[in-house]
């Protein structure tokens, strides 16, 4: 008998790297999207932490009135934020090497652009990584589809809205109070509360919370008991078991009699599709609403829509909301604007009849 031994050629370093990156046996799946996701998110997080702690004030309105957002300049966790880049920069990309000095880059809010661009790249790579991991495991791709809803919302406030308004200074600040300030100003300028797509978003968030609470409570209340009365019902469950862990027939019967028959799902797949689709579709619509309002296609205006027989205005809640919008409008960027168009009451008057003579 003859035995032939053949030496196996060792894999190249590139092949070993590819095998490691695409392996589904790693504790954390990396994937090709992860190769780009990891450095971009690390860059965004590192710059955010440093800027939140110690960035100097930023001339956000471009009028030489810097706004402080970091902890070392007197803010706390609630009021602190990474202030958006200056209105003097507009939509220009502003990397460090475009500034004359590091101080100038910080003064004009360069860290904001660095953070949001790396963050948006990292987030969309995270979506791609979800699809890639599902593909390698033979799963369907709906996880990344669901994640696309918050991703669309992120892109709408950090990219689409500044593009529509003409400056990254209109982007959402990276902080708690900054987020609320962004919401108030958005309401004042676009009347988002009266936009149908925002109403869908409210229905998606609040309705999704309600549906999740209802589903979780029904499942927890109809667990199939495999233990004695003296033991927790949780001990009767084994990870990966083939049997149903709860009785969907009992849950369907309970909920159908609590409200009415057709308000309850009898099919588990239909139920879980609805639980996933409802908030996702509504957040998609919200992102679409912000993206359209970015180009000033604003919410409905029902101001002074009701008058009596004498022609006098009968105020409605739309008029109350409009007064609140005007209050927000005059409070923000107080020194950056003079007489906003929606507050101008009379005809415009010239402030100078002739050009001044400069002797110098």
Curated annotation (Swiss-Prot):
Chlorophyll a PD1 binds at residue 198. Fe cation binds at residues 215, 272. A quinone binds at residues 215, 264-265. This is Photosystem II protein D1 2. GO terms for molecular function: chlorophyll binding; electron transporter, transferring electrons within the cyclic electron transport pathway of photosynthesis activity; iron ion binding; oxidoreductase activity, acting on diphenols and related substances as donors, oxygen as acceptor; oxygen evolving activity. It is a multi-pass membrane protein. Tyr-161 forms a radical intermediate that is referred to as redox-active TyrZ, YZ or Y-Z. Residues 345-360 form a propeptide. The record marks 190 as: Stabilizes free radical intermediate. NCBIfam families: psbA (TIGR01151). It is an enzyme of class 1 (oxidoreductase). The D1/D2 heterodimer binds P680, chlorophylls that are the primary electron donor of PSII, and subsequent electron acceptors. It shares a non-heme iron and each subunit binds pheophytin, quinone, additional chlorophylls, carotenoids and lipids. D1 provides most of the ligands for the Mn4-Ca-O5 cluster of the oxygen-evolving complex (OEC). There is also a Cl(-1) ion associated with D1 and D2, which is required for oxygen evolution. The PSII complex binds additional chlorophylls, carotenoids and specific lipids. Keywords: Calcium, Chlorophyll, Chromophore, Electron transport, Herbicide resistance, Iron, Magnesium, Manganese, Membrane, Metal-binding, Oxidoreductase, Photosynthesis, Photosystem II, Thylakoid, Transmembrane, Transmembrane helix, Transport. The record marks 344-345 as: Cleavage. The chain crosses the membrane at residues 29-46, 118-133, 142-156, 197-218, 274-288. Belongs to the reaction center PufL/M/PsbA/D family. GO terms for cellular component: photosystem II; plasma membrane-derived thylakoid membrane. It is found in: Cellular thylakoid membrane. SUPFAM superfamilies: Bacterial photosystem II reaction centre, L and M subunits. The keyword DNA damage does not apply. Photosystem II (PSII) is a light-driven water:plastoquinone oxidoreductase that uses light energy to abstract electrons from H(2)O, generating O(2) and a proton gradient subsequently used for ATP formation. It consists of a core antenna complex that captures photons, and an electron transfer chain that converts photonic excitation into a charge separation. The D1/D2 (PsbA/PsbD) reaction center heterodimer binds P680, the primary electron donor of PSII as well as several subsequent electron acceptors. Coiled coil: none annotated.
């Amino acid at each position: 008998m003859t035995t032939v031994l053949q030496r196996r050629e060792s894999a190249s370093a590139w092949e070993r790297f590819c095998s490691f990156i695409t392996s589904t046996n790693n504790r954390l799946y990396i994937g090709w999207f992860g190769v780009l996701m990891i450095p971009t998110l690390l860059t965004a997080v590192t710059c955010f932490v440093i800027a939140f702690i110690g960035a100097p004030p930023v001339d956000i309105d471009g009028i030489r009135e810097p706004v402080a957002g970091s902890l070392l300049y007197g803010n706390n966790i609630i009021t602190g934020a990474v202030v958006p880049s200056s209105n003097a920069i507009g939509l220009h990309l502003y990397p460090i090497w475009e500034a004359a000095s590091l101080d100038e880059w910080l003064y004009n809010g360069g860290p904001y652009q660095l953070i949001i661009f790396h963050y948006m790249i990292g987030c969309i790579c995270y979506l791609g990584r979800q699809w890639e991991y599902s593909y390698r495991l033979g799963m369907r791709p709906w996880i990344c589809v669901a994640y696309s809803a918050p991703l669309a919302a992120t892109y709408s406030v950090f990219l689409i809205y500044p593009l529509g308004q003409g400056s990254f200074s209109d982007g959402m600040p990276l902080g708690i109070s900054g987020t609320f300030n962004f919401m108030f100003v958005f309401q004042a300028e676009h009347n988002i509360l009266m936009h149908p797509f925002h109403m869908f978003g409210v229905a998606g968030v609040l309705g999704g919370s309600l549906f999740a609470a209802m589903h979780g409570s029904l499942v927890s209340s109809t667990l199939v008991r495999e233990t004695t009365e003296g033991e927790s019902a949780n001990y009767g469950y084994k990870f990966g078991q083939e049997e149903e862990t709860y009785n969907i027939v009992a849950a369907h019967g309970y909920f159908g009699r609590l409200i009415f028959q057709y308000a309850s799902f009898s099919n588990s797949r239909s139920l879980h599709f609805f639980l996933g689709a409802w908030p996702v579709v509504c957040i998609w619509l919200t992102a679409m609403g912000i993206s359209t309002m970015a180009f000033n296609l604003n919410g409905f205006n029902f101001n002074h829509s009701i008058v009596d027989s004498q022609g006098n205005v009968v105020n409605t809640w739309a008029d109350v909301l409009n007064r609140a919008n005007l209050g927000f409008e005059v409070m923000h960027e107080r020194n950056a604007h003079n007489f906003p168009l929606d507050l101008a009451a009379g005809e415009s008057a010239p402030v100078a009849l002739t050009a001044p003579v400069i002797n110098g």
